[in-house]
């Protein structure tokens, strides 16, 4: 008798009013599973010119040290050396947010990224007027005894 009252209190079970599932044809079920992907994650391959334009714009919009360092980290993470125009924008951004150490480290990043010392010297020659204008000293000039 107690089980009758429990059933009456709970109400009718959901199974009594459940709709009966209609069997689907096999063709309709097969479309849900596939061995080949319909959607591909094809990405546009960014050219060096697009990369340069994007990072120049990013560095021109920098408002604080965090943004500057994040953009530098992202720019140097690619398997290429940023162009002198990107580096010039980064140096100007470093001086704009008054971050002298990061400006010096930009040149350390260049030195680590280039393939040989000749390329590093070319970057230094290209950026020398801007470096002198902004008053940025190289690590080699700050610590001559550590120069390799």
UniProtKB/Swiss-Prot annotation:
UniProt key word Membrane: yes
Highest taxon listed in the record's lineage: Eukaryota
Transit peptide: 1-40
GO cellular component: mitochondrial inner membrane; respiratory chain complex IV
Xref: InterPro entries: Cyt_c_oxidase_su5A/6 (IPR003204), Cyt_c_oxidase_su5A/6_sf (IPR036545)
Pathway: Energy metabolism; oxidative phosphorylation
Annotated GO MF terms: cytochrome-c oxidase activity; metal ion binding
Listed GO biological process terms: mitochondrial electron transport, cytochrome c to oxygen
Quaternary structure note: Component of the cytochrome c oxidase (complex IV, CIV), a multisubunit enzyme composed of 11 subunits. The complex is composed of a catalytic core of 3 subunits Cox1, Cox2 and Cox3, encoded in the mitochondrial DNA, and 8 supernumerary subunits Cox4, Cox5a/Cox5, Cox6, Cox7, Cox8, Cox7a/Cox9, Cox6b/Cox12 and Cox6a/Cox13, which are encoded in the nuclear genome.
Role: Component of the cytochrome c oxidase, the last enzyme in the mitochondrial electron transport chain which drives oxidative phosphorylation. The respiratory chain contains 3 multisubunit complexes succinate dehydrogenase (complex II, CII), ubiquinol-cytochrome c oxidoreductase (cytochrome b-c1 complex, complex III, CIII) and cytochrome c oxidase (complex IV, CIV), that cooperate to transfer electrons derived from NADH and succinate to molecular oxygen, creating an electrochemical gradient over the inner membrane that drives transmembrane transport and the ATP synthase.
Protein name from the UniProt record: Cytochrome c oxidase subunit 6, mitochondrial
Originating organism: Neurospora crassa (strain ATCC 24698 / 74-OR23-1A / CBS 708.71 / DSM 1257 / FGSC 987)
